[in-house]
Amino acid sequence: MKVAVTKAKSYEKKAVGTAVDEAINLLGGWQKFIQAGDKVLIKPNMLTNVTPDKAVTTHPEVIRSVIKAVKKMGAYPAVGDSPGISNIKATAKITGILSVCEEENIPFIYFKQSKTYNYMEGRFIKQFELVDCLNDFDKIISVAKMKTHVFMGVTGAVKNLFGCIVGTEKARFHLRMQNHSDFAHVMVDLYQLIKPTLNIIDGITAMEGQGPMSGDIVNPQILIASEDGFAADLVMADKMGFNAEAMPIVSAGIGQNRIIRLADIEIVGSGKDEQFEFAKPHTYKSMQDTYIPRFILKLGQNQLTAKPVIKKSCVGCGRCSEHCPPKAITIINKHAKIDYQKCIRCYCCQELCSYQAVILQDGIILKLLKCIGIYK
């Protein structure tokens, strides 16, 4: 299995187009993936309504390059997503994705309506409620963003498909799959159901630390591409300086015998030797069960994971309350308040807060384990 890693110093159109084409050519060329007449859905990471310079969403110039390449093949591209907030059109506009679609004269599809998709091969989920238009397309291209993620360690090609679940329906999965491992297995099933033709990860700018929303911007200046999303994510996590095979989604895929190992991947391209050391999410170590004895995990899961804490800078906008899966957040006197008896540590509040007013703090047992050296 090949994964291409190419370099682009900026989001200037020519630089991005060159990097995208180099990557796809190394994988066999656009003709291997897209044929004339194909209807192609391009799925960006359009997490929330922030501008492209924040490194939260897929940059519109990467989307433009993919659109142009698909059109050049005589195919018919469209772009679509369902962000974690209700106003899809505002998000599409602010992220710059809508403008690119208008400039390139292609449709932007607002993921609003769901339908049931059966997947009997699923290990955890055999039926998904996803956006109703997926079967209208011959090919799907996932164009993700290179970021850390406080719940999943990293987010890339596979996690990007969570956006095919419409709007607040995402909360149902967080309620059903409340720990890293179970949620990761659902992502494996979701990926296998949708099975994109091609996966591209925008890492020209990226996010480290408390991603996918509140981290710090870094500049790896790379793009990653593969026909296999797990392989792309493995290489991405490794390039970020993470224990790639221990990340929940990748680990779940390995456990299901669905993916190959990092050592079996052929990495090619101008950026193949690039290596970085991203700051880890506050939750990073708690994702790796080997650090903590199993009996302790069973005794106090919430005290072993970081909890979200609302800072004084909270403006009481209500976004976290509206989208909290277990409804653990209320707004009192223009300030969010968390009921920790209900909190499931999904970190959706931290992920969606535009004011970076949600931070993560270690649980009591986690602090103790750090003090005595069991957990470093």
Each model region followed by its residue ranges:
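N-terminal and secondary-structure boundary signal
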Residues: 1-315, 321-335, 340, 344, ...
